[in-house]
Every structure is written in structure tokens, then in C-alpha cells.
Amino acid sequence: MLTITSYFGFLLAALTITSALFIGLNKIRLI
């Protein structure tokens, strides 16, 4: 159970970081 929770937590963190970087790059391009 703990392993699954940790896996989903890591996946969510990776997705959040990727989205943040993608949005950041788009803002830089707009500027």
C-alpha cells in the first residue's frame, strides 16, 4: 500500500514539475 502511494506521489510530482516547466517555456516564448 505504501509503495503504491509513494509511486502515485512521485508520478504526481513529476507531472506537476513537467507542467510547470512547459508553462514557463510558453510564457518565455510569448515574451
Curated annotation (Swiss-Prot):
Where does the chain cross the membrane? Answer: 4-24
Q: Which processes are annotated in GO (biological process)?
A: photosynthesis
- How does this protein sit in the membrane? Single-pass membrane protein
Q: Name one GO molecular function term.
A: electron transporter, transferring electrons within cytochrome b6/f complex of photosystem II activity
InterPro entries recorded: Cyt_b6/f_cplx_su6 (IPR007802)
One Pfam family assigned to this protein is: PetL
Keywords for this protein: Chloroplast, Electron transport, Membrane, Photosynthesis, Plastid, Thylakoid, Transmembrane, Transmembrane helix, Transport
SUPFAM superfamilies per UniProt = PetL subunit of the cytochrome b6f complex
Q: Does the keyword Transmembrane helix apply?
A: yes
GO-annotated cellular components: chloroplast thylakoid membrane; cytochrome b6f complex
Q: Which family does it belong to?
A: Belongs to the PetL family.
Query: What is the role of the protein in this entry?
Result: Component of the cytochrome b6-f complex, which mediates electron transfer between photosystem II (PSII) and photosystem I (PSI), cyclic electron flow around PSI, and state transitions. PetL is important for photoautotrophic growth as well as for electron transfer efficiency and stability of the cytochrome b6-f complex.
> What does the record note on quaternary structure?
The 4 large subunits of the cytochrome b6-f complex are cytochrome b6, subunit IV (17 kDa polypeptide, PetD), cytochrome f and the Rieske protein, while the 4 small subunits are PetG, PetL, PetM and PetN. The complex functions as a dimer.
- Protein name in UniProt: Cytochrome b6-f complex subunit 6
Give the gene name: petL
